[in-house]
Amino acid sequence: MRGLLSTEVETVGGRTMFFDKNITFFGLNASDRTDALRQMALSLKEANLVTSSFEKGVLEREECFPTGLAVGTFGLAIPHTDSDKVIAPQIAFASLKNPVKFRLMGNGEEEVDVSLIFMLALKKSEDQITMLQRLMEIFQNQELLKEFAECKSLEDFDQLLKQVELE
Protein backbone atom coordinates (compact mmCIF):
# COMPACT_ATOMS: atom_id res chain seq x y z
CA MET A 1 0.00 0.00 0.00
CA ARG A 2 1.37 3.41 -0.89
CA GLY A 3 0.63 6.74 0.70
CA LEU A 4 -0.47 10.02 -0.85
CA LEU A 5 0.47 12.97 1.36
CA SER A 6 3.69 14.60 2.59
CA THR A 7 4.72 15.38 6.14
CA GLU A 8 7.48 17.90 6.70
CA VAL A 9 10.24 16.87 9.09
CA GLU A 10 12.71 19.22 10.79
CA THR A 11 16.08 17.85 11.80
CA VAL A 12 18.39 19.20 14.48
CA GLY A 13 20.45 21.04 11.86
CA GLY A 14 17.40 23.03 10.80
CA ARG A 15 17.30 21.11 7.55
CA THR A 16 13.86 20.27 6.18
CA MET A 17 13.15 16.74 5.00
CA PHE A 18 10.02 14.86 4.08
CA PHE A 19 8.40 11.56 4.86
CA ASP A 20 6.64 11.35 1.51
CA LYS A 21 3.61 9.14 1.77
CA ASN A 22 4.20 7.94 -1.80
CA ILE A 23 7.25 6.14 -0.47
CA THR A 24 5.66 4.80 2.67
CA PHE A 25 4.78 1.12 2.44
CA PHE A 26 2.62 -0.95 4.77
CA GLY A 27 2.87 -4.71 4.25
CA LEU A 28 5.46 -4.47 1.46
CA ASN A 29 5.75 -7.83 -0.28
CA ALA A 30 9.44 -8.57 -0.89
CA SER A 31 11.08 -11.89 -1.71
CA ASP A 32 14.40 -10.95 -0.07
CA ARG A 33 16.55 -8.04 1.12
CA THR A 34 17.56 -7.01 -2.39
CA ASP A 35 13.95 -7.00 -3.59
CA ALA A 36 12.85 -4.81 -0.66
CA LEU A 37 15.71 -2.36 -1.20
CA ARG A 38 15.07 -2.21 -4.95
CA GLN A 39 11.36 -1.51 -4.50
CA MET A 40 12.06 1.28 -2.04
CA ALA A 41 14.88 2.79 -4.11
CA LEU A 42 12.69 2.67 -7.22
CA SER A 43 9.95 4.61 -5.44
CA LEU A 44 12.50 7.29 -4.51
CA LYS A 45 13.79 7.38 -8.10
CA GLU A 46 10.28 7.60 -9.58
CA ALA A 47 9.61 10.59 -7.31
CA ASN A 48 12.80 12.24 -8.67
CA LEU A 49 14.28 12.36 -5.17
CA VAL A 50 17.42 10.35 -5.93
CA THR A 51 19.70 9.77 -8.91
CA SER A 52 19.68 6.64 -11.04
CA SER A 53 22.81 5.45 -9.17
CA PHE A 54 21.05 5.50 -5.76
CA GLU A 55 19.79 1.90 -5.94
CA LYS A 56 23.21 0.54 -6.89
CA GLY A 57 24.80 2.62 -4.13
CA VAL A 58 22.39 1.30 -1.49
CA LEU A 59 22.87 -2.32 -2.60
CA GLU A 60 26.68 -2.03 -2.70
CA ARG A 61 26.83 -0.28 0.66
CA GLU A 62 24.56 -2.91 2.22
CA GLU A 63 26.97 -5.62 1.05
CA CYS A 64 30.02 -3.87 2.54
CA PHE A 65 28.41 -2.26 5.58
CA PRO A 66 25.25 -4.13 6.60
CA THR A 67 22.49 -2.12 8.30
CA GLY A 68 20.42 -4.86 9.94
CA LEU A 69 19.67 -4.38 13.63
CA ALA A 70 18.21 -6.74 16.21
CA VAL A 71 16.44 -4.59 18.78
CA GLY A 72 14.64 -6.66 21.38
CA THR A 73 12.12 -8.75 19.46
CA PHE A 74 12.34 -6.58 16.32
CA GLY A 75 14.55 -6.79 13.28
CA LEU A 76 14.97 -3.56 11.36
CA ALA A 77 17.31 -1.97 8.85
CA ILE A 78 18.44 1.56 8.04
CA PRO A 79 19.94 1.31 4.53
CA HIS A 80 21.53 4.39 3.01
CA THR A 81 24.27 5.46 0.61
CA ASP A 82 26.37 8.49 -0.26
CA SER A 83 24.68 11.88 -0.30
CA ASP A 84 25.84 12.64 -3.86
CA LYS A 85 23.16 10.20 -5.06
CA VAL A 86 20.38 12.24 -3.42
CA ILE A 87 18.48 15.02 -5.19
CA ALA A 88 16.13 15.95 -2.34
CA PRO A 89 16.25 14.68 1.26
CA GLN A 90 13.84 11.90 2.04
CA ILE A 91 13.20 8.94 4.32
CA ALA A 92 11.32 5.98 2.87
CA PHE A 93 9.56 3.68 5.35
CA ALA A 94 8.41 0.09 4.85
CA SER A 95 6.86 -2.48 7.10
CA LEU A 96 7.23 -5.85 5.40
CA LYS A 97 4.48 -8.40 4.85
CA ASN A 98 7.01 -11.12 5.71
CA PRO A 99 10.44 -10.53 7.26
CA VAL A 100 13.53 -10.77 5.04
CA LYS A 101 17.10 -11.51 6.11
CA PHE A 102 19.60 -8.67 6.51
CA ARG A 103 23.13 -9.07 7.77
CA LEU A 104 23.74 -7.47 11.16
CA MET A 105 25.39 -4.08 11.38
CA GLY A 106 28.92 -4.42 12.72
CA ASN A 107 28.90 -8.18 12.10
CA GLY A 108 28.56 -9.13 8.46
CA GLU A 109 28.20 -12.83 9.23
CA GLU A 110 25.09 -13.03 11.42
CA GLU A 111 21.65 -12.35 10.00
CA VAL A 112 18.47 -10.88 11.41
CA ASP A 113 14.88 -11.20 10.16
CA VAL A 114 13.91 -7.61 9.31
CA SER A 115 10.31 -6.43 9.26
CA LEU A 116 10.86 -2.62 9.35
CA ILE A 117 13.04 -0.61 6.96
CA PHE A 118 13.88 3.08 7.20
CA MET A 119 15.76 3.98 3.98
CA LEU A 120 17.66 7.24 4.32
CA ALA A 121 18.23 9.50 1.33
CA LEU A 122 19.83 12.58 2.86
CA LYS A 123 21.82 15.34 1.14
CA LYS A 124 24.23 16.23 3.93
CA SER A 125 26.35 13.70 5.78
CA GLU A 126 25.74 15.56 9.06
CA ASP A 127 21.98 15.16 8.52
CA GLN A 128 22.53 11.45 7.97
CA ILE A 129 24.44 11.13 11.24
CA THR A 130 21.85 13.18 13.13
CA MET A 131 18.96 11.14 11.73
CA LEU A 132 20.72 7.83 12.41
CA GLN A 133 21.23 8.91 16.03
CA ARG A 134 17.58 9.98 16.34
CA LEU A 135 16.34 6.71 14.84
CA MET A 136 18.57 4.72 17.20
CA GLU A 137 16.93 6.54 20.13
CA ILE A 138 13.48 5.64 18.78
CA PHE A 139 14.51 2.02 18.18
CA GLN A 140 15.25 1.58 21.89
CA ASN A 141 11.51 1.81 22.61
CA GLN A 142 9.89 -1.59 21.95
CA GLU A 143 6.37 -0.12 22.17
CA LEU A 144 7.15 2.40 19.40
CA LEU A 145 8.63 -0.33 17.22
CA LYS A 146 5.48 -2.38 17.76
CA GLU A 147 3.38 0.62 16.70
CA PHE A 148 5.47 1.10 13.53
CA ALA A 149 5.10 -2.62 12.75
CA GLU A 150 1.32 -2.53 13.29
CA CYS A 151 0.79 0.71 11.38
CA LYS A 152 -1.64 0.09 8.51
CA SER A 153 -2.78 3.58 7.47
CA LEU A 154 -1.27 6.91 6.56
CA GLU A 155 -3.22 8.57 9.36
CA ASP A 156 -1.78 6.20 11.96
CA PHE A 157 1.71 6.65 10.49
CA ASP A 158 1.36 10.44 10.60
CA GLN A 159 0.26 10.29 14.26
CA LEU A 160 3.20 8.04 15.07
CA LEU A 161 5.63 10.49 13.42
CA LYS A 162 4.17 13.27 15.57
CA GLN A 163 4.49 11.11 18.68
CA VAL A 164 8.21 10.52 18.06
CA GLU A 165 8.68 14.15 16.99
CA LEU A 166 9.59 13.32 13.41
CA GLU A 167 6.62 15.27 12.08
Predicted features by range, described:
Residues 1-167:
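Cytosolic covalent-transfer regions centered on His/Cys nucleophiles
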